[in-house]
């Protein structure tokens, strides 16, 4: 009985030992795998899970169709509509087949997953069975664990004993070597002090180098902007930025502690500096971030450089403007000399202008030959003096009219040289054309002066005949009464003559300005002929209707009243109409109207006949005594500018001057109010357009 109890106790002890040693339990993975399969079975047993699965299949299939464009929507919609109209059952069957295919595929995937999990479970169970057969009894395991623990404790003790021996030896060495270590520590401290100093010097050198590099890059950018400037300014720009680094070195020596404190923000300051100078591109990364003094100082230096550049630019612009002004003055002097010389040869003449000048000279020579004999007999020095003065005044008008064309230097520095060359060429071309205009005007003036001299000679011959008759006849008291209204008429006519002379000079200035501004455009060869015809138009104004000068003397005293009324009407006429008439004649007069000069000879013959037929009354004698020759000339010009000239018919194109032309013209001339900035020649009237074409 005792043996049985012992065996029973032994068996009980073995079971306890087995439990304490934990004979290898099955892995938790197996339990999880079993639970997953159980969960799948439980979930799919409910119908809600199946509904969710179907919904997911539909949604993700739709996503796949949209993402990968698996369906042609147009064909699909058209075919589906046709199929629904024809065979709705076929559509339903096709849809069912497609859905069943999807469902079968999904179930096949699930079955594969589940079957693979079942295979893994079987393999794990087989491995556990094999391990259970090989396992050792638990008593042997206990012994093995105890032996391993003892082996681990022994090497730890050995390591501790070795460490204690080493510590003792180190303690002895410390006691012996305390004094020499102190000296070594002093040396090490000195070396450490020297090393940070060298480091600081190296840092300062790096800072200086980086600053110099940034300055050089800034200089290069400046040079790219200053390529078109003159060399001295570039030299100044090179000298100026070299000064700041010395001051910066001093600041670096004075402020080393500040750098050490603010090294945290060095990289930020470096990036800001690089973006300010424009060196760093978005793809690059800074290799050496040098700490600058403060973020404000480089910006200040750049602003100072920009201010210096602006000052230098201003100086250079002033120099350029002064040089261009000097050149323009020299060109003006040359052009004036050419106009004074007048008849010198000029290379820029086109052949047609030469032909027209030759025609003018031949016409003038023919007129001179016909009328030299009459004019030589009747010339007097008193008549020649005021005419010379008139010539000088007209030449003075010509010269300032030529000067106003100036080429102002443009603000952009890039185009200065090109503009200067263009200005020289344009001024040379303009000077040649101005000289041509000056020559033509002088020739026209000489023709006018000869006609005036002839008229004055005729009047002087009439005066001589009258003086001979005066000596024979006596003076009467009634003549004195008639003198007074005539003298008043003459006094009134003097300011009118002056006003008309001023108006004529201003009109000529306007026409010359227009002629000067036009050479910039491309001028066809036909236009110089028109210009000469226009200049011929001036004498035709003054030569029209010279008859009233000779007929005015023998008239009854009523003629004096008529003259007074005419002068009053003239004074009331606004100056704008006179300007318009002169302007219209010069611009819009056609070459068909010009040959009025050819009628001068018969007009002069009529003057002679009128002077012979006129009765020699006492009034005429007294007038010829008291009135000087210059007043007679003024009366002639008054008669020429009488309102009879204004009553002549005006062509349609001279009448219409509208700002916005609407296709209908007025019977009377309408002048737009000219603004001071506008050129009077640039009116958009249809008449001018047709004439220019």
Swiss-Prot record:
Residues found modified as Phosphoserine: 301
Protein name according to UniProt: Triadin
Transmembrane is among the record's keywords: yes
Region: Disordered, residue numbers: 117-260, 278-649, 666-693
Annotated function: Contributes to the regulation of lumenal Ca2+ release via the sarcoplasmic reticulum calcium release channels RYR1 and RYR2, a key step in triggering skeletal and heart muscle contraction. Required for normal organization of the triad junction, where T-tubules and the sarcoplasmic reticulum terminal cisternae are in close contact. Required for normal skeletal muscle strength. Plays a role in excitation-contraction coupling in the heart and in regulating the rate of heart beats.
Glycosylated residues, chain numbering: 515, 584
GO biological process: establishment of localization in cell; heart contraction; release of sequestered calcium ion into cytosol by sarcoplasmic reticulum; response to bacterium
Cytoplasmic topology ranges: 1-47
Gene: Trdn
GO CC terms in record: cytosol; membrane; nucleoplasm; plasma membrane; sarcoplasmic reticulum membrane
UniProt superkingdom: Eukaryota
Start-end of Basic and acidic residues biased regions: 131-241, 249-260, 305-352, 366-427, 438-502, 526-547, 558-579, 587-637
Topological category with respect to the lipid bilayer: Single-pass type II membrane protein
């Amino acid at each position: 009985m005792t043996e049985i109890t012992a065996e029973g106790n032994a068996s009980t002890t073995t079971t306890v030992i087995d439990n304490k040693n934990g004979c290898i339990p099955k892995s938790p993975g197996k339990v999880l795998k079993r639970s997953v399969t159980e969960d799948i079975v439980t979930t799919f047993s409910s119908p809600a899970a199946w509904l969710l699965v179907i919904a997911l299949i539909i949604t993700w299939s739709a996503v796949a169709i949209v993402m990968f464009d698996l369906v042609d929507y147009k064909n699909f919609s058209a075919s589906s509509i046709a199929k629904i109209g024809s065979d709705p059952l076929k559509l339903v069957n096709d849809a069912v087949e497609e859905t069943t295919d999807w469902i079968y595929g999904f179930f096949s995937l699930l079955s594969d997953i589940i079957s693979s999990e079942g295979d893994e479970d079987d393999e794990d169970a087989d491995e556990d069975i094999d391990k259970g057969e090989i396992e050792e009894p638990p008593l042997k395991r206990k012994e093995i664990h105890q032996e391993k623990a003892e082996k681990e404790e022994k090497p730890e003790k050995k390591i501790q004993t070795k460490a204690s021996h080493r510590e003792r030896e180190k303690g002895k060495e410390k006691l012996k070597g305390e004094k020499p270590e102190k000296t070594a520590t002093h040396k090490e401290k000195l070396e450490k002090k020297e090393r940070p100093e060298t480091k600081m010097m190296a840092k300062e050198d790096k800072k200086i180098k980086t600053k110099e590099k940034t300055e050089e890059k800034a200089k290069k950018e400046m040079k790219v902007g200053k390529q078109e400037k003159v060399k001295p300014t570039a030299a100044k720009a090179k000298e100026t930025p070299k000064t700041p680094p010395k001051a910066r070195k001093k600041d670096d020596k004075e402020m080393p502690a500040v750098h050490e404190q603010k090294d945290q923000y060095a990289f930020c300051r470096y990036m800001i500096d690089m973006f300010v100078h424009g060196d760093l591109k978005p793809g690059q990364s800074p290799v050496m971030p040098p700490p600058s003094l403060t973020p404000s100082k480089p910006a200040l230096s750049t602003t100072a450089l920009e201010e210096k550049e602006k000052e230098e630019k201003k100086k250079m612009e002033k120099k350029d403007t002064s040089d261009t002004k000097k050149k323009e003055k020299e060109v003006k002097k040359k052009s004036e000399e050419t106009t004074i010389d007048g008849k010198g040869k000029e290379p820029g003449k086109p052949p047609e202008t030469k032909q027209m000048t030759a025609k003018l000279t031949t016409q003038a020579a023919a007129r001179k030959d016909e009328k030299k004999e009459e004019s030589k007999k009747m010339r007097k020095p008193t008549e020649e003096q005021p005419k010379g003065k008139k010539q000088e005044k007209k030449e003075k008008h010509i010269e300032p009219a030529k000067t106003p064309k100036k080429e102002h230097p443009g603000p952009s520095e890039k185009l200065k040289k090109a503009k200067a060359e263009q200005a020289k060429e344009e001024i040379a071309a303009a000077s040649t054309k101005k000289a041509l205009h000056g020559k033509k005007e002088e020739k026209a003036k000489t023709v006018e002066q000869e006609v005036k001299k002839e008229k004055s000679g005729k009047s002087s011959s009439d005066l001589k005949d009258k003086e001979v008759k005066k000596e024979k006849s006596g003076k009467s008291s009634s003549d004195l009464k008639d003198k007074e209204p005539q003298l008043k008429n003459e006094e009134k006519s003097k300011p009118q003559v002056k006003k008309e002379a001023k108006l004529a000079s201003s009109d000529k200035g306007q026409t010359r300005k227009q002629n000067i501004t036009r050479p910039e455009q491309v001028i066809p060869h036909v236009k110089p002929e028109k210009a000469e015809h226009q200049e011929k138009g001036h004498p035709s104004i003054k030569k029209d209707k010279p008859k009233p000068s000779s007929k005015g003397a023998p008239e009854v005293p009523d003629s004096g009243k008529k003259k007074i009324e005419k002068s009053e009407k003239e004074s009331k006429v606004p100056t704008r109409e006179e300007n318009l008439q002169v302007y219209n004649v010069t611009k819009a007069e056609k070459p068909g109207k010009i040959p009025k000069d050819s009628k001068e000879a018969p007009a002069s013959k009529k003057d002679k006949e009128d002077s012979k037929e006129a009765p020699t009354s006492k009034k005429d004698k007294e007038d010829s005594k008291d009135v000087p020759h210059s007043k007679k000339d003024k009366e002639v010009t008054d008669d020429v500018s009488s309102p009879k000239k204004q009553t002549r018919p005006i062509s349609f194109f001279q009448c219409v001057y509208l700002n916005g032309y609407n296709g209908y013209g007025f019977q009377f001339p309408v002048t737009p109010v000219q603004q001071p900035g506008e050129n009077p020649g640039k009116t958009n009237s249809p008449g001018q357009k047709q004439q220019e074409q």
